[in-house]
């Protein structure tokens, strides 16, 4: 008897859940940029690092836009429940081979139908190493995937008919299907993928507002997609994503009524935003984690005895509680692991978690032991981007390291998030760097595989440990949910031994909205559910 693994009400985590944005559509007006027109909501954003290709978008500036332009097989609602999107059903009788049946009324915004081959072609393209997609690793669970050799067509994907295809993959694979890497692509995308990324055609709740809708470093203007037919509805006429050089500037615009929704409060306003915004302030639990990653190629910080001693010393020299109380006004929670408390399987008793606790004497001792192996000279520079809300706490961490370890430590600031990411990917940052993570889909695996698996695209510390990789592989092939969580926790204990990054805190979701909008709800991943927002 077939049983549906993915269906209405399936929850992938303990208390969370929405990554895709939502809506149903009727015709939208025109708003080619600049001031938003009637019914258009304005939202803060950062400039996307790359073109708007779902399988190549790995940061939130592009991710928010991609999720508004597309709809996947499923989506996660604001409470973490998996709901059907383009899929009518996803069924398996063995947890290995999945049959996907699509709705027959789904279309792209250019009017072409969304068919089974649009998913299969998009996935094959993303999985092929020759295409260098940032989310390639999300297809590693499908039979036939290769990390090293180009594969034109995955053995585990088969088109049955226009509205049916099958997937042969690991048992946990369906949990991820709401993530943007799995969105379909229209045939036209493959004619010139780079050009497509600048003017994408999706099948979601919104579409680009005509030619020139993406004004680089300024704004991205979307309107309701009048071709969308699906389970969700849009309560506004569109979204104007406004690119800001700093969150302070965005917050000032919010207070002045020049911005409708701000999805992150700057650290300089934590003490006052709830008083200034009143019941329009958002302060809730989230699934964002903040860490400091350290490249394994950085002298004195490699994956040898000296490097592990220094990594542990830096971690134990940070007084997380003090920074959270003074800078974040208590809105964050000190980290005790590498995932998030809102995901299923979270454990706060992992072996090695003492490395995440403030212990000044032990930190000094470990640093001295490392110096006995190879003396450290120079300055520990801790890096972040200055167009985000991080400069103040980065300075606090540097000051604590200097005071507590008696070393030279200082911030290193990049002007933009894109420039910061470029240097991380090129392995030229030259010191510890901020490496926060927002869940792509509701699951603990997603907080480890993209960041720490050998060769993963967001593994900007270039960590490689075959034992850790093997534990993750065991987890995704586990026969039961309980066994999967057990293997994931064992993998975390390897991370706590090696410390490829320094977990700092679980970031609360703080935001706000203007008097010009209503029905503002933030999902589990701290992204507003844009389609539900109404313009007054």
Segments (PLM) and residue ranges:
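Surface-exposed binding/hinge segments that line
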Residues: 91, 134-189
């Amino acid at each position: 008897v077939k049983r549906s693994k993915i269906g209405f009400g399936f929850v992938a985590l303990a208390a969370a859940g929405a990554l895709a944005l939502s809506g149903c559509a009727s015709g939208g007006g025109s708003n080619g940029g600049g001031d938003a027109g009637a019914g258009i909501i304005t939202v803060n954003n950062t400039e996307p690092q790359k073109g708007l290709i779902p399988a190549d978008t790995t940061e939130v500036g592009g991710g928010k836009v991609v999720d508004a332009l597309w709809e996947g097989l499923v989506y996660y609602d604001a409470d973490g429940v998996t709901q059907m999107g383009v899929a009518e059903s996803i069924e398996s009788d063995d947890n290995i081979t999945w049959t996907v049946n699509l709705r027959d009324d789904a279309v792209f915004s250019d009017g072409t139908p969304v068919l089974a081959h649009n998913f299969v072609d998009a996935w094959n393209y993303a999985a092929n190493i020759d295409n260098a997609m940032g989310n390639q690793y999300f297809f590693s669970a499908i039979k036939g995937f290769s990390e090293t050799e180009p594969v034109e067509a995955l053995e585990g994907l088969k088109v049955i008919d226009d509205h049916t295809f099958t997937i042969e993959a690991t048992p946990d694979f369906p949990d991820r299907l709401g993530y943007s890497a799995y969105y379909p692509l229209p045939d036209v995308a493959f004619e010139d993928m780079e050009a497509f990324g600048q003017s994408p055609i999706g099948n979601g709740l919104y579409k680009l507002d005509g030619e020139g809708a993406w004004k680089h470093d300024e704004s991205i203007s979307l309107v309701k997609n009048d071709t969308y037919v699906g389970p969700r509805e849009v309560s506004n006429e569109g979204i104007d994503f406004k690119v800001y050089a700093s969150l302070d500037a965005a917050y000032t615009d919010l207070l002045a009524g020049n911005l409708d929704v701000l999805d992150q409060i700057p650290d300089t306003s934590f003490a006052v935003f709830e008083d200034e915004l009143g019941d329009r302030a958002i302060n809730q639990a989230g699934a964002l984690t903040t860490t400091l990653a350290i490249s394994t190629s950085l002298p004195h910080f490699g994956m040898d005895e000296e490097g592990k001693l220094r990594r542990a010393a830096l971690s134990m020299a940070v007084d997380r509680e003090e920074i959270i109380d003074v800078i974040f006004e208590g809105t964050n929670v000190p980290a005790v692991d590498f995932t998030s408390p809102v995901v299923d399987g979270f454990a706060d008793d992992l072996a090695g978690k003492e490395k995440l606790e403030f212990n000044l004497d032990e930190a000094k001792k470990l640093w001295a032991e490392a110096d006995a192996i190879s003396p450290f000279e120079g300055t520990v520079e801790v890096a972040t981007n200055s167009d985000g809300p991080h400069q103040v706490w980065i300075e606090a961490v540097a000051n604590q390291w200097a005071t507590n370890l008696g070393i030279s430590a200082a911030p290193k600031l990049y002007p933009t998030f894109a420039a910061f990411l470029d240097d991380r990917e090129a392995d030229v940052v030259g010191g510890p760097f901020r490496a926060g993570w927002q869940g792509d889909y509701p699951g603990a695996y997603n907080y480890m595989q993209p960041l720490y698996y050998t060769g993963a695209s967001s593994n900007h510390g270039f960590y490689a440990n075959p034992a850790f990789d093997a534990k993750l592989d065991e987890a995704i092939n586990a026969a039961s949910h309980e066994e999967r969580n057990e293997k994931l926790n064992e993998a975390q204990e390897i991370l706590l031994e090696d410390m490829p990054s320094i977990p700092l805190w679980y970031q609360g979701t703080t935001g706000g909205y203007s008097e010009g909008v209503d029905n503002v709800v933030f999902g589990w991943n701290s992204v507003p559910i844009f389609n539900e927002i109404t313009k007054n």
